[in-house]
Amino acid sequence: AASDVYKRQDMVHIGAVLRVTPIKDVKTMIRAFAYAKRDVPNLKLWIMGPTDEDEEYARECFDLVDLMELPDVVFTGRVNVTEYLGGLDFTILTSISEGQPLTILEGYAAKLPAIATDVGNCRGLLYGEDDDFGESGILTHIMNVKEIADAMVNLARHPVRRKQMGENGYRRVMAKYK
């Protein structure tokens, strides 16, 4: 349940809102999370969204979590994402292809910074296209486990920077998309 997000206040909660499909590259996200957890043991990853679109891929993701012994990766299935956003510290998107990712905008509306791969309009959302609000997240290359892990560690270890990026994202989404 959404209330579970709040049970461990000492945790840093990462949210991924997506369909569990190959184009979202959930396996890279899981591997990066495993590396990041070595440096920041109090991380928790919430993967929110349907798992029935590509059941074989979803099963491979579940198996990877089991194999890597990652009890702090939670697949919620379909949920009301807004119930979770307030308990998260930042969002993550590791897609290999994307258009205008709504999940980043939803996170910004909740003042959450984002880690995202450099696909679609992610660069514009994180760095601004025609505004001077500042960075609202960390951009990474696709399928780059180390870079994505480093971004997770960076945001997890720097709550002040995280808060500032979240504020920047909030201003960006309010100015451009409200």
Region spans (language model):
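Conserved donor-binding/catalytic core segment of Leloir-type glycosyltransferases
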Residues: 7-24, 30-33, 46
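A short, well-ordered alpha-helix in the C-terminal region of glycosyltransferases
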Residues: 154, 161-175
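Conserved acidic donor-binding segment of nucleotide-sugar-dependent glycosyltransferases
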Residues: 127-145, 154-159
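Glycosyltransferase donor-sugar binding loop
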Residues: 17, 44-59
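Nucleotide-activated donor-binding/catalytic signature segment of Leloir-type glycosyltransferases, i.e.
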Residues: 58-78
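Short, small-residue-biased leader/transition segments that mark boundaries at the very start
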Residues: 1-6
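Short hydrophobic beta-strand element within catalytic cores of glycosyltransferases
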Residues: 113-116, 123-126
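Aromatic "clamp/platform" in nucleotide-sugar-dependent glycosyltransferases that forms part
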Residues: 96
